[in-house]
Amino acid sequence: MIETILPAGVESAELLEYPEDLKAHPAEEHLIAKSVEKRRRDFIGARHCARLALAELGEPPVAIGKGERGAPIWPRGVVGSLTHCDGYRAAAVAHKMRFRSIGIDAEPHATLPEGVLDSVSLPPEREWLKTTDSALHLDRLLFCAKEATYKAWWPLTARWLGFEEAHITFEIEDGSADSGNGTFHSELLVPGQTNDGGTPLLSFDGRWLIADGFILTAIAYA
C-alpha cells in the first residue's frame, strides 16, 4: 500500500502479518533488550522492512541504530523513515542525492481518542473538519499527516516541531466510507533553517491513502 503514495526513486516495504521467526539484527538487540513484547515486535518489524527497502536501493542489510529523539540512523547517503501501528509496519528509503528527507506515518482508520484533537490541531484545521462532509476519519488523517511532517522535518533541522507549528490542508481525490486517497500540504509556521546546506524549509507536500483499515501518509522532499 505505502508504495502507491511514494514517488519514483523511493523504495519501501511493509509488513502486515508478523512472522514468528523474525528476529532483531544482532547489533540492534541491545536497543530493545528491556522492551515489552509489543515494542520489540514493532521495532524489529519496522527495521526488517527497512532492510528490505535498502536492498532495493542496492544497499547492504545493515543495523539501523537510534539517534536523538529515537530517530533511525541511516547508512551514509541514505534518507528514510519508519512507521508502525497495530497490525502494520513499514519503511521508506531513498538516496540523499535524490531526496533531502522522507517522512511516513501509519495510523488505524479510527477516530482520535476523546480530547486529543484539540491538542494536535489548529483552529483552521478544526474548522475544515467541521465543514467537510466525509465518512472518513479525517481527524486521524490530520494527526497522521502531522506525524509525517515531523518525521520529514527532524532530519533536516534536528529541532522539535510542535503540532501547532504546521498547518495542514487536504485535497480528497477519492473517498468512501472506508477508503480514500489524496494529497496534503504542510505549511510550516516556524523558521526552517536546515543542517544540510539546502534551502530553508517553508512547506512539505505529501500524499495520503486510507485502505484496509489503515491511514498512511507520506512526504518525499526533494
UniProtKB/Swiss-Prot annotation:
GO molecular function terms listed in the Swiss-Prot or TrEMBL record: holo-[acyl-carrier-protein] synthase activity; magnesium ion binding
Keywords: Magnesium, Metal-binding, Transferase
Binding site for Mg(2+): D105, E107, E147
Stored InterPro entries: 4-PPantetheinyl_Trfase_dom, 4-PPantetheinyl_Trfase_dom_sf, 4PPT_N, Enbac_synth_compD-like, P-Pant_transferase
Catalytic activity, as annotated: apo-[ACP] + CoA = holo-[ACP] + adenosine 3',5'-bisphosphate + H(+)
Gene3D superfamilies (alphabetical): 4'-phosphopantetheinyl transferase domain
Source superkingdom: Bacteria
Enzyme Commission number(s) of this protein: 2.7.8.7
Biological processes, Gene Ontology terms: enterobactin biosynthetic process
Cellular compartments per GO CC: enterobactin synthetase complex; plasma membrane
Cofactor requirement: Mg(2+)
Function (record text): Catalyzes the transfer of the 4'-phosphopantetheine moiety from coenzyme A to a serine residue in the acyl-carrier domain of carboxylic acid reductase Car, thus converting apo-Car to fully active holo-Car. Is probably also responsible for the activation of other proteins with phosphopantetheine attachment sites.
Subunit and interaction comment: Monomer.
Similarity field: Belongs to the P-Pant transferase superfamily.
Name of this chain's protein: 4'-phosphopantetheinyl transferase Npt
Natural source organism: Nocardia iowensis
Chain's gene name: npt
